[in-house]
Regions:
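Short, charged recognition helix plus adjacent turn
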Residues: 2, 64, 74-101
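A short, Lys/Arg-rich alpha-helix, primarily the initiator
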Residues: 2-25
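Short basic helix-loop element that most often maps to the first helix and adjoining turn
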Residues: 17-36, 61
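Conserved hydrophobic/aromatic packing and binding residues within compact polymer-binding modules
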Residues: 19, 33-34, 44-47, 73
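Core residues of bacterial helix-turn-helix
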Residues: 26, 37, 47-48, 66, ...
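Recognition helix of helix-turn-helix/homeodomain-like DNA-binding domains
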Residues: 38-54
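DNA major-groove recognition helix of helix-turn-helix/homeodomain DNA-binding modules
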Residues: 57-72
Length: 101
């Protein structure tokens, strides 16, 4: 993956691995996921191997197709990151802020 730092590569691999785990839990092939999100199977394979940098719209489409919220998908890929995000100023319990995802 030319141009990516070691940390960026780790992030791509973590998200790709999570997408693969969810896809496999659903019993879907890469081809089936690709058809549902109107992307090519080789793109999905590259994502799952951490070789492709997904744009936000593709993350949204993949998450929706798999029946998982984009936030939950990211939280599964980076479980310690969610706890590191401070609540926005004025956020209270139950308002849908990061602490309530």
């Amino acid at each position: 993956m030319p141009g990516y730092s070691a940390l960026e590569k780790q992030h791509l691999i973590a998200l790709g691995t999570t997408i693969r785990q969810v896809r496999e839990a659903l019993g879907w092939s890469q081809e089936q996921l690709a058809e549902r999100v109107e992307l090519h199977r080789t793109y999905i394979g590259g994502v799952e191997r951490g070789e492709r940098n997904l744009c936000l719209l593709n993350i949204l489409a993949i998450a929706e197709a798999m029946g998982i919220s984009p936030g939950k998908l990211i939280d599964r890929a980076f479980p310690t990151r969610a706890a590191d995000i401070p609540d926005p100023p004025g956020a209270t319990a139950g308002d849908g802020g990061p602490a309530n995802r």
